[in-house]
Amino acid sequence: MSRARISNYRKGVAAVALSAALAGAFVVTGPLGALNEARAEAVHVTPPPQAGFADLVEKVRPAVVSVRVKKDVQETSNRGPQFFGPPGFDQLPDGHPLKRFFRDFGMEPRGDSRSDNRRGKANKPRPGHERPVAQGSGFVISEDGYVVTNNHVVSDGDAYTVVLDDGTELDAKLIGADPRTDLAVLKINAPKRKFVYVAFGDDNKVRVGDWVVAVGNPFGLGGTVTSGIVSARGRDIGAGPYDDFIQIDAAVNKGNSGGPAFDLSGEVIGINTAIFSPSGGSVGIAFAIPSSTAKQVVDQLIKKGSVERGWIGVQIQPVTKDIAASLGLAEEKGAIVASPQDDGPAAKAGIKAGDVITAVNGETVQDPRDLARKVANIAPGEKAALTVWRKNKAEEINVTIAAMPNDKGKSGSQSNDNDGGQGETLDSYGLTVVPSEDGKGVVVTDVDPDSDAADRGIRSGDVIVSVNNQTVKTAGDINKAITAAEKSGRKAVLLQLQSNDQSRFVALPINQE
């Protein structure tokens, strides 16, 4: 074949190949367009096996109840001005739903203008009757109808009604209440009925970030379910000496008090008790009593109707950074004994003012609140080994736990009539002091408002009893104690103060110039 023919043959083949390629391109374009149209269809996602809490709620909800509380009201008369009812109440027509609502709750208009005929017997003194005063939530913990709720829900009541999830209303009686932990137990009056109930779980296994489900009766609406997570542990909200709340962000509102917070196993890990809210509604900050605390209290309330706690009889305060430095402690942990109560268990065992209790039965004490809880959980009559820090070393003291006595309010303050004369000035601390009349310590007569002493709350009239656990009677004794502390390398000195029959410790930094 000549070169010319070969060249023409190659050109022909190339042309055919190009035509085929173009044809193929058009063939492929059709299906690609169809694929694009398929991709425009709605996306369908298969849900995970556990998409919600419906199964859990279905099982636990029958055990959650609403609690209605009523109180006996003394004889009243409808004549004259009334103190209940909103402005404009008397302008509402008879039969108006709001008027019926307020009257159902014992509220009457200010100056009811109805005629005597329309009042019927209402113009006569009404006999004592029960008026609703509170409502909250609770949950059944036994087949025979024991119900756990909050003390603040039932504390003002004389009669109690429990409303089950199906709407059944049953009378109940108060078995016992514990204001210190804000817990109470009711017993439903239905001896032949077997109730669905829930169990307490172990809140010590609950971690921050775990799911929780809250069930309750917000605003009296009836069984309502919300969910959230554990936001924090060990919260102290100033409600009492045993504060140790679990913080959750599930929606909790008024009326949820006493209701349960469940883990995903359907066990109660907390009792919803309080919320933090500037508006009165839920802002995602709720507090629940841990189940470990509740179980101990509830068991005692059912058995005895009251709670008996361990007690050692000490006034305690936190170990601050300055106090730790003044005592040679490596950590700001424990509780310093401001004063042991005369003839109390601690005093009898040899616990002294200035001792720092760092452990109970080998368990570290974090702070005064932790010490109070640990001691309270020990049965009266048992012995407890307290580890105390005294004179730069730890030692163990056995204390026989007693039952906590009933609170006795301390009356009035005690004034100090010592005019102090001229007094001596401790220039480095901005204090002027004079010896006390009974020879026990020195009395502070003046405090420089710009001094460290003023910043730490020392005031005129306070009595300095000791410095670094050394008794003092003069300003010279104080200076000697400060000098000794400085030579030993301490950065602060510990003052024991007495005021209004109360003892406390204050650490002042040593001014090293």
From Swiss-Prot:
Main location: periplasm
This protein's record includes keyword Hydrolase: yes
BP-aspect Gene Ontology terms: proteolysis
EC number(s) per entry: 3.4.21.107
Locations listed in the record: Periplasm
Record's catalysed reaction(s): Acts on substrates that are at least partially unfolded. The cleavage site P1 residue is normally between a pair of hydrophobic residues, such as Val-|-Val
Classification via PROSITE patterns: PDZ (PS50106)
Signal peptide: 1-25
Binding site for substrate: 255-257, 312-316
Region (Disordered): 100-135, 403-428
InterPro entries reported for this sequence: PDZ, PDZ_sf, Pept_S1C_Do, Peptidase_S1_PA, Peptidase_S1C
Record has Protease as a keyword: yes
UniProt keyword annotations, A-Z: Hydrolase, Periplasm, Protease, Repeat, Serine protease, Signal, Stress response
GO cellular component terms given for this protein: outer membrane-bounded periplasmic space
Matches recorded under Pfam families: PDZ, PDZ_2, Trypsin_2
Residue stretches of biased makeup (Basic and acidic residues): 101-119
Assigned protein family: Belongs to the peptidase S1C family.
Function according to Swiss-Prot or TrEMBL: Might be efficient in the degradation of transiently denatured and unfolded proteins which accumulate in the periplasm following stress conditions.
Protein name: Probable periplasmic serine endoprotease DegP-like
Species: Brucella abortus (strain 2308)
Gene behind the chain: htrA
